[in-house]
Amino acid sequence: MSQYHIPVMLSEVLEVLAPKGYESYLDCTFGAGGYSNAILKSCYCSVTSLDCDPHVIERVEQIKQDYGERFSFIKTNFADSFGKLKQQKFDGIVMDLGVSSMQLDIAGRGFSFLYDGPLDMRMSAQGFSAEEFVNTADEEEISDVIYKYGNESLSRRIAKNIIKYRKIARIDSTRKLAEIVRYSIGFRKGKIDSATKTFQAIRIYINNELGELERFLANVKNILKKNGRLVVVSFHSLEDRIVKNFFKENSAKPVARSKYAKDEIKIDQNKWLEIITHKVLTPSSQEIRLNVRARSAKLRAAKKIL
């Protein structure tokens, strides 16, 4: 495994997913293969992995060499995967909704404000880039995106300064955007860089990350076997809210009845999930010390019962 990639909450994911021999699992976000590799290593099972990032292919080939026919890969976004999975159903599904270390640490991908590179941020290297967005969107749209997806209270000031700067020169690098944001906000106490929220917001918007998550969850029932488990690790409060509400809306509860009734408790047939993690799981302090990028991770899991 790449030395720079540390799968977030790996032990918790494996404990909740509970892989078993001869079962099949779906890794919706291959990244550098951390979850896929760990699941395959845990028992004699099979894993299908998804990712739309063309840069993962080298790691995909490594895992294929290690596990042979037990591992398969489909180059696709998880929200677009249903037709390509050819009616397969899985005993467990895992999703890591964060940007991988591999994406953050390559300056040319344009995800990170720590390295100077082209202002891109696209997961699939196709479609509208962050550079196009900050150089063409109007002030109100930029402000709304930064506020909605980054929860940045100074979004209007940042947007105003982006408009001012781009009248002088095109904003075409991560360094330029980060400097504009830092200038707009000024110094903030703490270890988190002032540009963090703005970069996160633009990345989420550019890749339609929340919409893709909602689209996948709306259809996930069709590819999960009965008693199959869905495990989701999110890194943003809006992502976590979507997952939490989805689990809540689809979780089965006993139908109310008289305490004197002798018939068995019935389950609402429109509800098909049983929540496994009644309280959200978060990384241990030890993991955060080893991998600061894990600090905002939240894990939720549920089981299909119908």
Curated annotation (Swiss-Prot):
Residues that coordinate or bind S-adenosyl-L-methionine: G33, G34, Y35, D51, F78, D96, Q103
First-level EC class: transferase
Assigned EC number: 2.1.1.199
Protein keywords: Cytoplasm, Methyltransferase, rRNA processing, S-adenosyl-L-methionine, Transferase
GO cellular component: cytoplasm
Catalytic activities: cytidine(1402) in 16S rRNA + S-adenosyl-L-methionine = N(4)-methylcytidine(1402) in 16S rRNA + S-adenosyl-L-homocysteine + H(+)
Domain of life from the UniProt record: Bacteria
Keyword Cytoplasm: yes
Compartment list: Cytoplasm
Cytoplasm in keyword set: yes
Molecular functions (GO terms): rRNA (cytosine-N4-)-methyltransferase activity
Job description of the protein: Specifically methylates the N4 position of cytidine in position 1402 (C1402) of 16S rRNA.
Stored PANTHER family: 12S RRNA N4-METHYLCYTIDINE METHYLTRANSFERASE, S-ADENOSYL-METHYLTRANSFERASE MRAW
Entry-linked HAMAP family: 16SrRNA_methyltr_H
Stated family: Belongs to the methyltransferase superfamily. RsmH family.
Protein name: Ribosomal RNA small subunit methyltransferase H
The species this protein was found in: Rickettsia typhi (strain ATCC VR-144 / Wilmington)
Gene name per UniProt: rsmH
